A protein has these predicted regions:
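Structural signal for interior beta-strand "rungs" in well-ordered beta-sheet cores
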Residues: 3-142
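Long, leucine- and charge-enriched amphipathic alpha-helices
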Residues: 145-158
Length: 158
């Protein structure tokens, strides 16, 4: 009820489900659906996959900017807002009041608690169990410099 879906968005498409078999891939039938709550706005060019087994869930009050991908079996909590060009991989469970800056991503099968803000261009690689602000921007540089920086940062964090 009271939802807005902008042009060229695809709702309920099959998730990316394939099983390797004899040096090729066999499509895994997607049996779930997609449920969208009230007062949701979905920007232009978004794709939201239906669930593989259970439903993909977009709860009340969610606001999605343009060109966002939400994969199969994701649960996106109420009153969440996601900026353009973000992706959330399959089977991720996200609490309410989630905010995600542009060009960010969340890996699959993670859980993110309520009241989490993700800064722009951040990749979430593990579950988040404490509310707060998270960011992980690292500007582009040649591979050798990046490798040295990554080792330095890891050592400093211990």
């Amino acid at each position: 009820q009271d939802c807005i879906v902008h042009p060229n968005s695809v709702l309920g498409s099959d998730g990316f489900g394939f099983a390797p078999e004899n040096e090729s891939y066999q499509k895994i039938e997607q049996l779930g659906g997609l449920e969208i709550g009230d007062n949701v706005e979905i920007g232009a060019g978004c794709t939201i996959d239906r669930g593989a087994i259970s439903n993909t869930m977009i709860f009340d009050g969610v606001k999605l900017d343009n060109q966002i991908h939400i994969a199969h079996n994701v649960s996106l909590g109420s009153n969440s807002a996601i900026a353009a060009n973000c992706a959330i991989a399959g089977s991720t469970k996200i609490g309410k009041n989630f905010k995600m800056g542009g060009l960010s991503g969340v890996l699959g099968h993670l859980e993110i608690c309520d009241d989490v803000t993700i800064g722009a261009h951040t990749l979430i690689t593990k579950s988040i169990k404490s509310s707060g602000n998270y960011i992980g921007i690292m500007p582009a540089q040649n591979h050798m410099n990046w490798s040295k920086s990554a080792v330095f940062i890891k050592k400093r964090g211990k």
